[in-house]
Amino acid sequence: MMENGGYVGQYGGEENYMEQEEEWEREGLLDPAWEKQQKKTFTAWCNSHLRKAGTSIENIEDDFRNGLKLMLLLEVISGETLPKPDRGKMRFHKIANVNKALDFIASKGVKLVSIGAEEIVDGNLKMTLGMIWTIILRFAIQDISVEEMTAKEGLLLWCQRKTAPYKNVNVQNFHLSFKDGLAFCALIHRHRPDLIDYSKLSKDNPLENLNTAFDVAEKYLDIPRMLDPDDLINTPKPDERAIMTYVSCYYHAFQGAQQPGSTPFVIHLTKTGLSYRFFVRLFAAETAANRICKVLKVNQENERLMEEYERLASDLLEWIRRTMPWLNSRQSDSTLAGVQKKLEEYRTYRRKHKPPRVEQKAKLETNFNTLQTKLRLSNRPAYMPTEGKMVSDITNSWKGLEHAEKAFEEWLLAETMRLERLEHLAQKFKHKADTHEDWTKGKEEMLQSQDFRNCKLNELKALKKKHEAFESDLAAHQDRVEQIAAIAQELNTLEYHDCASVNARCQRICDQWDRLGALTQRRRQGLDEAERILEKIDLLHLEFAKRAAPFNNWLDGAREDLVDMFIVHTMEEIQGLIQAHDQFKATLGEADKEFNVIIGLVRDAEAIVKQEQVPGGLVNPYTTLSADLISRKWSEVRALVPQRDQTLANELRKQQNNEMLRRQFAEKANAVGPWIERQMDAVTAIGMGISGSLEEQLHRLKEYEQAVYAYKPSIEELEKIHQAVQESMIFENRYTHYTMETLRVGWEQLLTSINRNINEVENQILTRDSKGITQEQLTEFRSSFNHFDKNRTGRLAPEEFKSCLVSLGYSIGKDKQGDMDFQRILAVVDPNASGYVQFDAFLDFMTRESTDTDTAEQVIDSFRILASDRPYILPDELRRELPPDQAEYCIQRMPPYKGPNAIPGALDYMSFSTALYGESDL
């Protein structure tokens, strides 16, 4: 697997080796130095095989792109024939060929991940190197086997064995261990000492060592130069794959050529001219050494198995000897807990302690059989264990152990069942006794309690019901007490180990049961007597409550009526109050009788409570009222009656005086009010301009003004009467509908109307004279205005104003343009946006429309004449043509002219003129 190269290779049957490969590939990304080494090494390795087919490659990422040489390489190294390649040059032909090669690799049990034909065809160097490395692993390294180690570990062990005798060589890996070249030289010298004089090599000269090894391997061993000495020396950590590839060539060269009589061996001797006898001796020595090592290793393993058997047998037999007494013991403390503890110990023994011994016995038998088989196969005599440790001895001891286990377990289960039955009976006794004692807790104290002597009647009845329920419960518990006694008797019969405590507890329960019966009867008698006394007191309390509640309500109502702070405004009201008070006084006799009955009920209850000494007997549960409260309220009511008589008499005199003031005010107001209304109607008629000229209207208005001021003393006299009415707090007067406020408002409105109408008439005269309109025109305008002033308010709403204009012949369209024109007219007649049009504004607008008036355009034309048709005017021209004060007025208010061709001091008369008529922002 190669993460940085983007591929994963795995072979079936070599999972351990491929897992190691995965670990190698996790170290990091493929750096440029390693990539360069791999490219050079893999290219040389491929060429070493391709030359057998008469071809080679120059650039590994390009020459395999069409897939042809890749398929040829696989055929050479596998000795098998691949499918016929596609000969086209199109991309899909190349992909098809590469896929055939990849399929062949996969058929050899190699799992390819992330390696696709497209990457190889595209010349992806990392993918190509990864693919070649996968091929090298499968066809050059995987089959290496040294002492049950395969692939990388086998190749590394082979290197270590071969180089062990050599100085300065310590092969631990496939990168740094080969960096100085001595390991390569040692491998060659070990197999071909005639090719290298190892004693002359130095660790301090790695370049010479590497060149020597590579040259000798290429010249005499037919191993091409796959590594560059400079790259190995200058790289801190040379590429492991490149070195493994090169070292695997050494392995195949030496292992394939070492067999005497083999064709490669004979050809090799022929090429080198060396002695055949020399290599036979060399091979024989190595074979003899290997045979001795193998025999010694077998003998050592057999001795180890014998020692282990003796140790395991002794340990197992000793454990059985220690365990048997415990299994044969039948001692018990006759308690269920003790037997259950023994049973749990036995289960722990079966669960934790025995399983390892079962495994130990099985291992012992397996080791014995294995040992005997190995001895037989190696022609050794059979193994005889020491006395008492034969397999049969162990089997017999084991059977005895299992028999003891079975008997011990059966005894434990039987004893457990017996004690469980007895313990169940004891637990049943305990449970029933506990339940009974829990039920009886507090019962004696409850029955001896005198709590009912401090109870009210309802509480006492509840206690009596509760006691009746307890008596029923007591009768129901009689069966439980009998069951407890029966169980105790049975435990005694069965000789329960703790019978003493059972009997003592049973006796306590029976004694307590007798006491509870006596106390129950005594408490019932006490409850009955207390109920009789409280019922008698309760009847008195109930009667008191029935009478006291309505009487108390009557007292509260009477007291409220007597102290009521009444407010009256008429004689009828005060007379009604006096009549109601007289009726109340007539009921006081019956009330006094009821009061005496109520107080008598309380005294009777007090006598019984004192005689029977009933705690809390004076507390009435039916009411919160008391005799003292009723007595106090009755005394208060009797004292308030004469006070109420005096208050009503005083109020009667006050109302008689108020009636006189009402009549005086009404007489005067009924005269003033109509007079003000008549004057207001006359002034309004004049203001409407219905008849007469403006001068006549003005004359009549001034006459009315004099008459109104002459009537003012009557108003002042009415104010004095009103002041007296206010001081007497009189707010209503049935003799007149006029109030002082309405008369004041009417008087002020009259004065205001006269002044306003005088001002309007004077303004109309001024407008008529200045505009030159005739009396007929003025009358027409007034008539139209009055016609649409439906409410006679002296003003028109916008819609009324619009209708008035239309009636006078003013054209206003009903389209959007007409609405815009009307809004402009409204802005003129109602500049403050009050929502109404006064007659003065209406008249001013109509006179503008019907007469020739000055406009902003006329003023602009006049200024243009003074300025000689220029768009601006100079201050000197204004001073020359206008009076001095008016000239200075214009100069101060005219803005500077900012148009084209302006000269210093030029003034803008156009903006000034439009501002005079409110048509600009100036």
Curated annotation (Swiss-Prot):
Family annotation (Gene3D superfamilies): 1.20.58.60, Calponin-like domain (1.10.418.10), EF-hand (1.10.238.10)
Record organism: Anopheles gambiae
The protein, known as: Alpha-actinin, sarcomeric
Placement of Spectrin repeats on the sequence: 253-393, 394-508, 509-629, 630-742
Family (UniProt): Belongs to the alpha-actinin family.
Entry GO terms, CC: cell junction; cell projection; cortical actin cytoskeleton; plasma membrane; Z disc
Subunit organization: Homodimer; antiparallel.
GO molecular-function term, one example from the UniProt record: actin filament binding
Biological-process GO terms, alphabetical: actin cytoskeleton organization; muscle cell development
Lineage: Eukaryota, Metazoa, Ecdysozoa, Arthropoda, Hexapoda
Residues binding Ca(2+): 789, 791, 793, 795, 800
Alphabetical keyword list: Actin-binding, Calcium, Metal-binding, Repeat
Protein role: F-actin cross-linking protein which is thought to anchor actin to a variety of intracellular structures. This is a bundling protein.
Residue numbers spanned by region Actin-binding: 1-252
Domain (EF-hand) ranges: 776-811, 817-852
Residue ranges occupied by any Calponin-homology (CH) domain in the UniProt entry: 36-140, 149-255
